[in-house]
Amino acid sequence: MARFFYDSYSVLAYLSDSPGYAAYFEKNTGVLTRLNLMEIYYAILRVHGATAAHEVLEAYSAREIEFSLLDVETAMKLRYELRKLELSYADAMGYHIAKKEGLKFLTGDKAFEGLPGVEFIP
């Protein structure tokens, strides 16, 4: 069973039944940070309301991986190095955590296409 870092994009794509994502969530395991949980909650809240957002938050909170102040520094340095990609704080942290933990970074975000350690689903 493979382990992945689930970018917010991938979770929202899976929840929207986008092609190609089901196997990564149903046959594998993955983690995400609290920053991703915040992005996902807000995206669901805007479209489906507070009840649906809360249900998704509850469902994915068990997959949360914490990060340290050293992770903050490293992720923001990485964000600076990749500034042409215009990564969000959450994206930079997630990509850093994936690399640190030896996980594939699962996303469909075009900014990550072709980067090392990324499992990109168009």
Predicted regions and their residues:
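Short, well-structured N-terminal submotif of metal-dependent ribonuclease cores
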Residues: 1-32, 43-55
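Short, hinge-like loop/turn segments at secondary-structure boundaries
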Residues: 47-51, 82-83, 121-122
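Active-site regions of enzymes building and remodeling cell-envelope glycoconjugates
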Residues: 29-32, 62-63, 115-122
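A generic structural signal for short hydrophobic patches within well-formed alpha-helices
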Residues: 11-12, 37, 112-113
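Active-site neighborhoods of divalent-metal-dependent phosphate/nucleic-acid chemistry enzymes
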Residues: 65-104
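Histidine- and aromatic-rich ligand-binding microenvironments
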Residues: 6-7, 32-34, 87-88, 109-110
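Amphipathic alpha-helical segments within well-ordered protein domains
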Residues: 38-41, 57, 76-79
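Acidic, PIN/NYN-like endoribonuclease modules and their adjacent C-terminal/linker elements
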Residues: 1-2, 95, 99-122
